[in-house]
């Protein structure tokens, strides 16, 4: 039901499929046990960025794109903006930074990718609507563990707060890692509110992207 990187969302959108598995595997399901509670098991014990970089060069790659953040709100870099990052939780190391250093030693270009454009709808009651609220079980998880709001949210709408947060994280990646290229995902083409996202609410980050490329 869906594909791997969308499982965090599908847990809540397809509970008949996923809740029994979580119950069997971890003894509970949302809201008692949700996506946030799986993160400690992400340890990256076999993560060897030097070996990866060497292999990429060997096969003839000239640049590498690694996911800095997908739609789920988890940051694979050493972020000062969210506690849900790979240095403070999970692997306890800077995955984005470590790979970048290894790639540059091999003379390869580096482009952390950023997919937060679709984050507001990932855990929302109404997917990709301009204005929504958290899925019921997500809301209950946040009520029980307030820190979870920084993973699942902080907003579930294309609000000014969302845009400010989006730009701040994107800017942090640029300032900390100085990537050779910028790669970002697309904003949802359609929304239930007349596609206002593409028509205006994304302008701040698009302008920042344009300025950063110049």
Predicted stretch roles:
Residues 1-214:
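Mature catalytic domains of secreted/periplasmic carbohydrate-active enzymes
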């Amino acid at each position: 039901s869906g594909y791997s990187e969308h499982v965090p969302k599908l847990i809540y959108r397809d509970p008949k499929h996923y809740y029994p598995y979580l119950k069997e595997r971890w003894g509970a399901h949302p809201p008692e046990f949700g996506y946030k509670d799986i993160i400690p098991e992400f340890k990256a014990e076999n993560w060897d960025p030097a070996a990866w970089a060497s292999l990429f060069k060997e096969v003839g790659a000239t640049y590498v794109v690694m996911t800095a953040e997908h739609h789920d709100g988890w940051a694979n870099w050493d972020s000062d903006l969210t506690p849900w990052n790979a240095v403070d939780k999970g692997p306890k190391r800077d995955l984005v930074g470590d790979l970048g250093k290894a790639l540059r030693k091999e003379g390869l270009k580096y482009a952390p990718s950023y997919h937060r454009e679709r984050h507001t709808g990932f855990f929302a009651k109404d997917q990709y609507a301009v204005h929504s609220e958290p899925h019921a079980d997500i809301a209950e998880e946040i009520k029980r563990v307030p820190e979870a709001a920084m993973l699942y949210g902080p907003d579930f709408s294309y609000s000014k707060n969302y845009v400010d947060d989006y730009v701040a994280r994107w800017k942090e990646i640029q300032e900390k890692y100085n990537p050779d290229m910028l790669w970002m995902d697309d904003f949802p083409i359609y929304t239930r509110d007349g596609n206002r996202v593409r028509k205006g609410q994304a302008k701040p980050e698009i302008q920042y992207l344009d300025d950063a490329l110049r």
